[in-house]
Amino acid sequence: MEPYSCDTFVALPPATVGNRVIFGKNSDRLFDEVQEVIYCPAAVHNDLEKRLKCTYIEVDQVPETYAVVLSRPAWLWGAEMGANEHGVCIGNEAVWGREDISKEEALLGMDLVRLGLERADTAEKALDVIVDLLEKYGQGGNCAEGKEFSYYNSFLIADRNEAWILETSGKYWAAERVQGVRNISNQLSITTKIDREHPDMRNYAKQRGWWDGKEEFDFTAAYSYIDTAAMMTSPSRYCQGYKLLDKHRGNITFETMMEILRDRPSGINMKGEFLTTASMVSVLPQDPSLPCIHLFTATPHPERSVFKPFIFVPHISPLLDTKSPTFEPERPVAKKPYVKPDRRHPLYQKHQEALEMISNSKEKGKTILDKMRKLEKAVSEEIESILQSGHLDEEKTVNLFPQYVKDEIKIYQSNISS
């Protein structure tokens, strides 16, 4: 399978408008994989002898886990991207390098995303959680449902105050504290600016003959085949993504991030066997009195999707219209030939019908797209109102994301049936 993956972005003040950290990710997965958006409340775990079942393996549970909102492939436990109640956001990317990829079942990168969000109230603490779990349990296993697809992982971790890039190769890793703007794609990208690292990372590279111990250590050059001297002038999605961020430096808003995620010429908005199956943008105000706001599509094709807002408040209403059906627990690739169950959630089903209408009828397609953009404009106006005023109607906010999902479904239903 061709090694295509995702793109994750972050921009920090002064690159942004309004003293806000802006996070964004496109999840590029197999074209027919359904991604759901779910909410998991905070929890206290008194029985710590009871282990936590992740996608393939069990890990030790912790006394307390935080509330999280996750965008995830519906067949697994972890998540492609998400946020927690403390404003921590994480997205991961598939990466490949010199180290052979382990197919032995361990923690998936997507499991590590969820575990980091559930267990950490700052970005750097999430980094600590992930590298500790990586050391204890390792990473590996099949990352697709019904097909062989394995990789190592890089992570972009952000909160209200800072952001980190964490890149891995097996159990070895390097981390970079972000300044200004930064993005990751499906390649290693940390070079000589290394702020934290695995204690044996350099020795291992030297033992393998990847570094002579004399030249300045370059993580990407040592652990991958990338020519880092040409990395920022190549036609790669990584390079194109950075150019899009840099183009808007000083004026980046959440709308800017949505525009970047919708960019087709760069390949960031992916089409083909690997498709942008879901997208996320988060607004993390540095003022702690203001809420963090997280926007999810829960549908593929961001240029034909609506970003809908989620805000953490007590007593969140269930996200029923973006929750996939639940099936009997089974190993994703245990049965051969493997037949995928129908994991489409209600929004996904109506969105697929609308996409067909957009493709087949120019007039109806324009009507649907116009209404979608109008709905998203209302989203943007509501977000700005909340961030400018600081006022949050909690009774309304418990239904904020579910209501916008219902409004989106109504657009599709009214035009499909007419």
From Swiss-Prot:
Family that this chain belongs to: Belongs to the peptidase C69 family. Secernin subfamily.
Modified sites of kind Pyruvic acid (Cys): C6
Residue numbers annotated as active site: C6
Sorted UniProt keywords: Pyruvate
Organism in which the protein naturally occurs: Mus musculus (Mouse)
Single Gene Ontology MF annotation: cysteine-type exopeptidase activity
InterPro entries xrefs: Peptidase_C69
Positions annotated as propeptide: 1-5
Inactivation phenotype: C57BL/6NJ males exhibit impaired thermal nociceptive sensitivity in a TLR4-dependent inflammatory pain model. No effect is seen in C57BL/6NJ females which is consistent with sex-dependent differences in response to TLR4 activation reported in this strain.
Annotated signal sequence range: none
PANTHER family xrefs: SECERNIN, SECERNIN-3
Glyoxylic acid (Cys): residues bearing it: C6
Domain of life: Eukaryota
Protein name: Secernin-3
Task performed by this protein: Plays a role in thermal nociception.
One annotated GO biological process: proteolysis
